[in-house]
A protein has these predicted regions:
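Extended, hydrophobic alpha-helical segments in both membrane/secreted and soluble proteins
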Residues: 106-110, 214-219
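Auxiliary tRNA-acceptor-end handling modules of aminoacyl-tRNA synthetases
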Residues: 1-98, 116, 120, 131-218
Length: 219
């Protein structure tokens, strides 16, 4: 293929390529988090394990629920029904490269998740923070840090990969990637799915407050 085919969605063969790759390795806790069996009626991601037994000729698949390690800082108060902070809150670091008009919606989207966490007894369980500017150890490519990243390319989508402890299903990292043209996707969704009921989206330019709410939904 010619070099001019690059970026046009075509297969490229016999062309030189340079790729920068980050390898991130973390040490798991000696004692894994207590696993919880997945309930297929609840829409969460599972981790599968195969159980081998000398008493059976075949393996049995076990599915653990992928979940964060949220442990109460005040166990006694938690048992008594008080709302407590977790020992280790869930922290998402927000990319400083996002368009300014997106940032408020992203922070609000993360903080809104504190509402369901409060119903199970945790306050300040999840936090959104800006990329640290004065921490030389911070690296958004390090699995130690869950991040919400800005991808300045023309894909109309967002994605949220996660990495878990295979022994228990404990979520170790869950980063979110927002591609720049996710806004175009939201415009299409809003018009096609809601225009019949919402006259605000029956325009070429959808009002800012409607788009902000849609962006919170995606995050």
């Amino acid at each position: 293929r010619r070099s001019s085919d690059l970026g046009k969605g075509k297969d490229i063969k016999d062309e030189p390529l340079t790729a920068k790759v980050t390898r991130s390795i973390i040490l798991l806790d000696t004692i894994p988090y207590r696993p919880r069996l997945m309930d297929s009626r609840i829409g969460i991601f599972p981790t599968m394990k195969n159980e081998y037994s000398a008493a059976k000729q075949t393996t049995r698949s076990i599915y653990y629920a992928n979940r964060w390690r949220l442990e109460p800082s005040d166990l006694r108060g938690y048992i008594e029904g008080k709302k407590v902070t977790p020992i280790k809150p869930i922290v998402f670091y927000v990319d400083s490269c996002f368009p300014e008009s997106w940032k408020a919606s992203i922070f609000e989207a993360v903080n809104q998740w504190n509402e369901p966490f409060e119903k199970i007894g945790f306050t300040q369980a999840i936090q959104a923070k800006e990329f640290p500017k004065d921490d030389p150890e911070f690296d958004p490519d390090n699995l130690k840090y869950s991040c919400i990243r800005y991808a300045p390319i023309g894909i109309e989508n967002a994605m949220g990969p996660s990495w878990v402890d295979p022994r228990s299903g404990e979520i170790l990292n869950a980063s979110v990637y927002l591609y720049h043209n996710v806004i175009k996707l939201l415009n299409n969704w809003l018009f096609i799915q809601t225009a019949q009921a919402d006259k605000r989206v029956r325009h070429k330019v959808i009002p800012r407050e409607v788009m902000d709410d849609a962006l919170r939904y995606v995050v």
